[in-house]
């Protein structure tokens, strides 16, 4: 029998319903795995007592044949989803001891469906990063190692703890957030399915804000079917979130295994020119194209002419929104407060924010404040918003001709911890292929599609028009079926 912590969400639900094992046994198997691999630093707060209590309640529900859609399934939550009575830090010193008195919309939805929370996962501070190295709790180590090198690798960011937890079999699924690629890029680096829904599909209520017009909850799983199951539980209108879309929750599981014959899939190969993509990833892109052709899809060459400006646009808009959102952390209302004798209010603000924020967060606050200043707002912020509209228009034009778009999730495989740390611009380019869809608010997924020559996982990204999560899953399922001979599992786990 497969180890319980290695079961998928779907297989776990099946086993629980058939009384093959209990939720408590399932949770204990995950706790054992978490304890075994603490060196990866995937979790910052463990909630084992809560998980065991929820598991007992789940087992009682199964005994009475009254189970809900996620009854007894162990999951983890990125530490920017507020959890009532449980520390929520966004991995920043300024919120290190913050305990919210309310529950985020997404975690509440999962609890309402019977989910069991194992803990809160590590992340880049305030979700600002691409390697999970800016956390106040230290960096996360990927469960993966290259075949030719035993060096520790990054799991990607900012949702690196969630990616490491699911990849290392320390959670069946894990919540992440995706602002410019923070679910899809880590999923690519760790061999997972990482899904970002349409902007507004999932409630942002109770999510610690980074960039409000871009932030969206996402999910890490080890299969496309699991992704559809979790999404159906997460999605839903929330009147407490002004950006929440008021629509019925779609039925997504029927997309799995559905034929893609006759689907038109757009491929913007011109985005791969100029040597920015590693050869292994270019090879995977072409092999995935052939795989989809064999499955009956029609491949169409398309152009996204403004996508190349995505990174520049993002690093104006996101820091601008962050500088506004993070102004609330002033040492007065909640969070860290640093005081000294005879200190003025201005000095308290300065010392608190200097002590509470890390270097990357300070960098982005300063960039954001600069581009919003009266002297430069027209030149940077307003111009960036105009180009953002052009990026979205490119996608709209493409979707007039195609049903889905195929792109790599990242231009590189996972890299060594510390390798790109001293050059922020190189780090920012990791989100080259994920940012455009975020700027347009589109649903997208990273699905494992190959291994590099060094044995590291590589992800392909599927993007569809707004609210078309169904076809995203449909194409992702076809890719998954085409590479089922590849084992996306780190050695030793």
Swiss-Prot record:
PROSITE patterns: AMIDASES (PS00571). It comes from the Bacteria. InterPro entries: Amidase, Amidase_CS, Amidase_dom, AS_sf, GatA. Disulfide bonds: none annotated. Gene3D superfamilies: Amidase signature (AS) domain. The active site is at residues 78, 158, 182. Its EC number is 6.3.5.7. The keyword Nucleotide-binding applies. One of its GO terms (molecular function) is glutaminyl-tRNA synthase (glutamine-hydrolyzing) activity. The keyword Electron transport does not apply. GO terms for biological process: translation. SUPFAM superfamilies: Amidase signature (AS) enzymes. It holds the Pfam family Amidase. It catalyses: L-glutamyl-tRNA(Gln) + L-glutamine + ATP + H2O = L-glutaminyl-tRNA(Gln) + L-glutamate + ADP + phosphate + H(+). One of its GO terms (cellular component) is glutamyl-tRNA(Gln) amidotransferase complex. Keywords: ATP-binding, Ligase, Nucleotide-binding, Protein biosynthesis. It is an enzyme of class 6 (ligase). Allows the formation of correctly charged Gln-tRNA(Gln) through the transamidation of misacylated Glu-tRNA(Gln) in organisms which lack glutaminyl-tRNA synthetase. The reaction takes place in the presence of glutamine and ATP through an activated gamma-phospho-Glu-tRNA(Gln). Belongs to the amidase family. GatA subfamily. Heterotrimer of A, B and C subunits. NCBIfam families: gatA. HAMAP family: GatA. This is Glutamyl-tRNA(Gln) amidotransferase subunit A. It comes from Rickettsia bellii (strain OSU 85-389).
């Amino acid at each position: 029998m497969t180890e319980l912590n290695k079961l998928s969400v779907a297989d776990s639900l099946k086993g629980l319903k058939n009384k093959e094992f209990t939720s408590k046994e399932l949770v204990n198997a995950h706790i054992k795995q978490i304890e075994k691999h603490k060196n990866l630093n995937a979790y910052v707060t463990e909630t084992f007592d809560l998980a065991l209590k929820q598991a007992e309640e789940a087992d009682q529900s199964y005994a009475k044949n009254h189970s809900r859609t996620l009854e007894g399934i162990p999951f983890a939550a990125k530490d920017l989803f507020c959890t009532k009575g449980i520390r929520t830090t966004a991995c920043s010193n300024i919120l290190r001891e913050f305990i919210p008195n309310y529950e985020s919309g997404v975690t509440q939805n999962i609890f309402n469906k019977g989910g069991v929370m194992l803990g809160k996962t590590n992340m880049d501070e305030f979700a600002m990063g691409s390697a999970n190295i800016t956390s106040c709790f230290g960096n996360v180590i990927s469960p993966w190692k290259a075949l030719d090198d035993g060096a520790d690798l990054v799991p990607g960011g900012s949702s690196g703890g969630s990616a490491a937890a699911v990849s290392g079999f320390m959670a069946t699924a894990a919540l992440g957030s995706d602002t410019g690629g923070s679910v899809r890029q880590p999923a690519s680096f760790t061999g997972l399915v990482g899904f970002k829904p349409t902007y507004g599909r999932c409630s942002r209520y109770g999510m610690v804000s980074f960039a409000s017009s871009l932030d969206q909850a996402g999910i890490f799983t080890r299969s496309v079917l699991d992704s559809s199951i979790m999404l159906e539980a997460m999605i839903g209108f929330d009147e407490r979130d002004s950006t929440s879309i008021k629509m019925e929750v779609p039925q997504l599981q029927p997309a799995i295994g559905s034929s893609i014959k006759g689907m038109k899939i757009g491929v913007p190969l011109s985005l791969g020119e100029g040597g920015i993509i590693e050869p292994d990833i270019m090879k995977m892109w072409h092999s995935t194209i052939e795989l989809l052709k064999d499955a009956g899809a029609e491949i169409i060459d398309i152009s996204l002419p403004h996508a190349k400006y995505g990174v520049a646009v993002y690093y104006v808009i996101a820091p601008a929104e962050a500088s506004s959102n993070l102004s609330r952390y002033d040492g007065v209302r909640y969070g860290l407060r640093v005081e000294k004798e005879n200190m003025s209010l201005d000095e308290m603000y300065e010392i608190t924010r200097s002590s509470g924020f890390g270097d990357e967060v300070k960098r982005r606050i300063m960039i954001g404040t600069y581009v919003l200043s009266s002297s430069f707002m027209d030149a940077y912020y307003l111009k960036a918003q105009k180009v953002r509209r052009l990026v979205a228009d490119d996608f709209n034009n493409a979707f007039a001709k195609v049903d889905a778009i195929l792109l790599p999730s990242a231009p590189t495989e996972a890299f060594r911890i510390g390798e790109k740390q001293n050059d922020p611009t190189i780090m920012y380019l990791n989100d080259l292929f994920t940012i455009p869809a975020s700027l347009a608010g589109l649903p997208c997924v990273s699905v494992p599609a190959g291994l590099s020559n060094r044995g590291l996982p590589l992800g392909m990204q599927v993007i569809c028009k707004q609210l078309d999560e169904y076809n995203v899953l449909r194409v992702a399922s076809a890719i998954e079926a085409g590479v089922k001979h590849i084992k996306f599992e780190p050695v030793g786990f």
